[in-house]
Amino acid sequence: MVSIRPDEISSILKKQIADYDKSVSVSNVGTVLQIGDGIARVYGLEKAMAGELVEFEDGTEGIALNLEDDNVGAVLMGEGLGIQEGSTVKATGKIASVPVGDAMLGRVVNPLGQPVDGNGEIATSDSRLIESLAPGIIKRKSVHEPMQTGITSIDAMIPIGRGQRELIIGDRQTGKTAIAIDTIINQKGQDVVCVYVAVGQKSASVAQVVEVLREKGALEYTIVVNASASEAAALQYLAPYTGAAIAEHFMYQGKATLVIYDDLTKQAQAYRQMSLLLRRPPGREAYPGDVFYCHSRLLERAAKLSDAMGSGSMTALPIIETQAGDVSAYIPTNVISITDGQIFLSADLFNSGLRPAINVGISVSRVGGAAQTKAIKKIAGTLKLELAQFDELAAFSQFASDLDEATQQQLERGKRLRELLKQAQFAPLNLAEQVAVVYAGVKGLIDEVPVEQVTQFAAELREYLKTSKPDYINQVLTEKKLSDDIEAVLKESINEVKSSMLAAA
């Protein structure tokens, strides 16, 4: 028979009492009632907050969006293949946040800030809430510094300033992304941090963009946030806010930032999908009632901060895709009313060979004029008007058989201006080159050059200035204005290039 030794029992009891942890952990737990289509209905979670992160049994995260009487509607930020009815859900008490910092530069991340480029973990300890309040009026300053895109027609006629929101709108395949990528490439050496947010795009297209940025040496100051078409609707909806949060980190450090949302139409569609599955009442075009707020709270985060706040800036270039050029649809009109101007790309102009296919007539920059450099402002004042008049006259001249000399001259000048503004993709021009090209056209110095040779003339002029007149380029780039001396040098250069071209012909 085993003898029971009291001292052994007492020592075991003492050890257990010593090891006893009396701390109590309280967690808000619920049960999955229904799961499917990226939406989970959860019973319980009484204390869940709107927008709170919830964690499912299989590790998938979700966001509590619908707080109803008897259940919580959550959207999944992942596949959620391991989630079953009856499995437990835990409220985390946190709102979605994303890692930020210099370590993010040159990386491709998903909307949760996790790297997807195969280059290892991102070593940063800083994080920032994905949703945060936009700066108030007192914290802002009016837009007054230029954000050069490197695209002559934009910098001359639709100038963009640091801290502005400028919409790029047009049908599919009209060169919207090309303008955005050119703008990123043009920021090289300007100490601007760029964030490119790809929403609902093909992974192959995003890989191509990343490769172009790498080739042009632009990836080192760019962060790419990718929520491809194959990802959950919740991630596509979150991606733009993630991009804004990453840029805000640099903005509040006093840096200039540029964010491209490509495109917000896909984000609105993802939000519509989530809202309809959550059984929220649909409105116009089946979008939920708060889709305007979805975009306005995102774009209001772009700002030029006051000196007291460090003078940082976030410039936003949202992209919207239209159907058959219809800018009066719901999402286009919403975003047009939120932004500080729009660049409208026309499929007809694109197909006629004008690249970038900017329709100058309905494109506008509401605040960029104050930020435009003096050099280009001085000469480009009449450019937009002349091109608009040319479009009108070109349409009229198709029906009129005999035109007076002044009209004929205006048409000829318009054709040459059109040719001058044509630009190759991924080849942004600096300010001095833009000034030279626009000056030659507006002042009528190339009226004798045949239309088909204008593009060649522009290329030769730029090359001549680089090799023979480097002082002109340096002076315009440093002073950013066109003095009488520089203007004389420019005029002489244009005439020399023109003479040699006409002589060769």
Curated annotation (Swiss-Prot):
Q: Where in the cell is it found?
A: Cellular thylakoid membrane
- Membrane topology per the record? Peripheral membrane protein
Annotated GO MF terms: ADP binding; ATP binding; proton-transporting ATP synthase activity, rotational mechanism
Q: What Gene3D superfamilies does the database record attribute to this sequence?
A: 2.40.30.20, ATP synthase alpha/beta chain, C-terminal domain (1.20.150.20), P-loop containing nucleotide triphosphate hydrolases (3.40.50.300)
Which top EC class is given? translocase
**Domain of life of the native organism:** Bacteria
Keyword match Transport = yes
Keyword set for this entry?
A: ATP synthesis, ATP-binding, CF(1), Hydrogen ion transport, Ion transport, Membrane, Nucleotide-binding, Thylakoid, Translocase, Transport
Q: Which residues form a coiled coil?
A: none
Positions binding ATP in this chain are 170-177
Database matches in Pfam families: ATP-synt_ab (PF00006), ATP-synt_ab_C (PF00306), ATP-synt_ab_N (PF02874)
Q: How does it assemble?
A: F-type ATPases have 2 components, CF(1) - the catalytic core - and CF(0) - the membrane proton channel. CF(1) has five subunits: alpha(3), beta(3), gamma(1), delta(1), epsilon(1). CF(0) has four main subunits: a(1), b(1), b'(1) and c(9-12).
Q: Which HAMAP family match?
A: ATP_synth_alpha_bact (MF_01346)
PANTHER family in the record:
ATP SYNTHASE SUBUNIT ALPHA, MITOCHONDRIAL
What name has this protein been given in UniProt?
A: ATP synthase subunit alpha
| Native source organism of the sequence | Prochlorococcus marinus (strain SARG / CCMP1375 / SS120)
